[in-house]
């Protein structure tokens, strides 16, 4: 495949998003990633099924460029295979609770006994140390415990974001940490643990809100889509849809006032002197912007705001996002084949481009156990030994 991480072998014991997407990012830039699954397929393979075999949209998104083997690591024979595999690896990714890592012998001490310079990248729900360190959780626990859900929507009921931003943010942090650990190992020869946590990620994303609360005790309450620290910042109805407009900073506000044709009104009123004042008086500004948008189609509003260099975008359905001319022209999505799909899957490339050494989606996601025989043969197992492991239910 090539890439900046060519020669790095990663074992992906991850499940769902935080671990697997971390490994995906490493694979996209050249690492050899081997996904290790249960014999009958791990649960995350089948989330939101779209294929004849039950493979889901999430699996297709976060498992391109990977090999896949099946293995039962809870047996002695499975442990033997795993130790041989670990001995060839640079990184193990496993977003599993500490007690599960210990039971599977994927804890750092066990891995280090086999490969002294191994890097273990792991992510838990709550991190630690702390009274909740051994508890399990998904993306939503980070959202609800960071202040994000409290501040989303109108407050009753609170709303969790539909997109798993905590999981994906944790994957990004873990990939960054893994790269840093690989650089350090190149200098010192030492491996280490890279530890992410869903709650830590969520708190890092909401941190400015927490700082404001801690320092000045502002006690903000949710206000729907209406921004609270600048204006206009809201989602507005147009003649045929909805459009977002976000204005932060006085230069942008001056552009907006000029576009409204009311510079004297908006730029000389002390209620709108700076961002926080505009945020405090957001409903007044938003009402004016709402009237402006209501007179236009979404396309007219977006084009006019865009030409004025005011941040804006249309509210798109998933199908509209797929069809949007800029998204298509930019090549953010790559059509990928997979056995049993009625059509190609539009898989999002890594959202960062390197000018000289770009990442690539070089291979489709693997079928269950597609590379088991090949990987085991590389470890020294002959056909008879592989057949015996399969007969015994180890692979």
Walk through the language-model features, giving the residues of each:
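Short Gly/Pro-enriched turn/cap motifs at secondary-structure boundaries
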Residues: 59, 223-228, 233-234, 342-345, ...
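Oxidoreductase and adenylate-handling cofactor-binding alpha/beta cores
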Residues: 171-191, 204-215, 257-263, 267-268
């Amino acid at each position: 495949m090539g890439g900046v991480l060519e020669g790095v072998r990663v074992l992906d014991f991850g499940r769902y998003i935080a671990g697997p997407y971390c490994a995906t990012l490493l694979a996209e830039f050249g690492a050899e990633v081997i996904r290790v699954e249960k014999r009958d397929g791990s649960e995350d393979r089948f989330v939101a099924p779209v294929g004849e075999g039950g493979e889901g949209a999430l699996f297709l998104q976060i498992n391109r460029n990977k090999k896949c083997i099946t293995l039962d690591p809870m047996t002695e024979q499975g442990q033997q295979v795993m130790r041989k595999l670990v001995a060839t690896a640079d990184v193990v990714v496993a977003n599993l609770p500490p007690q599960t890592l210990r039971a599977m012998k994927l804890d750092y001490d066990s891995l280090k006994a086999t490969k002294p310079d191994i890097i273990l990248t792991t992510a838990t729900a709550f991190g630690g140390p702390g009274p909740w360190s051994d508890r399990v959780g998904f993306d939503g626990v980070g959202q609800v415990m960071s202040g994000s859900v409290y501040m989303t929507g109108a407050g009753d009921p609170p709303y969790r974001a539909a997109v798993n931003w905590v999981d994906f943010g944790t994957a990004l942090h873990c990939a960054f940490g893994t790269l840093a650990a690989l650089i350090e190992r190149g200098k010192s020869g030492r491996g280490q643990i890279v530890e992410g946590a869903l709650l830590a990620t969520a708190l890092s994303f909401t941190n400015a809100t927490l700082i404001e609360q801690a320092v000045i005790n502002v006690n903000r309450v949710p206000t729907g889509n209406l921004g609270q620290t600048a204006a206009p910042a809201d989602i507005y109805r147009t003649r045929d849809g909805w459009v977002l407009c976000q204005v932060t900073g006085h230069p942008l506000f001056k552009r907006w006032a000029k576009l409204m044709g009311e510079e004297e009104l908006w730029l000389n009123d002390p209620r709108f002197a700076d961002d926080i004042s505009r945020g405090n008086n957001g409903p007044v500004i938003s009402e004016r912007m709402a009237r402006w948008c209501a007179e236009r189609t979404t396309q007219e509003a977006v084009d006019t705001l865009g030409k004025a260099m005011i941040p804006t975008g249309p509210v798109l359905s998933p199908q509209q996002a797929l069809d949007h001319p800029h998204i298509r022209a930019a090549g953010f999505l790559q059509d990928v084949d997979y056995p049993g799909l009625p059509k190609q899957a539009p898989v999002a490339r890594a959202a960062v481009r390197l000018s000289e050494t770009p990442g690539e989606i070089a291979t489709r996601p693997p079928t269950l156990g597609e590379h088991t025989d090949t990987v085991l043969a590389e470890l020294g197992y002959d056909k008879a030994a592989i057949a015996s492991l399969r007969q015994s239910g180890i692979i």
